């Protein structure tokens, strides 16, 4: 929060309507996520501090709403959306917007068009609740020689879970519990899943 100048902070307060908070992560084809000791897809301390300060501005009446935009092709851990300390009113996944996609985001925020898409991934309270995370480590190829193979091409991963990665695991795990298949045991779906695959809201209510 300290990296922002007073002019930036004052501009939010003088606007007074909605504070737009953008959370970004980098990762995709040919550029895997950062292997940190912490959870790269969770909020870091700087982001938490920023949301806390914006929430204080809202509490003081300087802004009316807090809207979070998730600028990432990967699924952030969204436990913060249910944290009253941050008091977030709305969140929209915008993916990697490219050169002109941000114009469409502005149209949505202004209410000129209505968002009607549904999530293509499952968003979790804790990304490490997935069994696949147990194998998410960079394994170096046997016989790898420094200077021969590019650094980014020296490692691989093993998917021991087969198809049960991401939403396929959570949906199947829950179905096994409901149907009492095998040794499924107890399972609380909503303790893991914040927003399921296919979830989506709009400015409009539809009747069928």
Model features per residue range: what roles?
Residues 1-207:
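C-terminal non-catalytic regions of proteins with extracellular/luminal or membrane-system context
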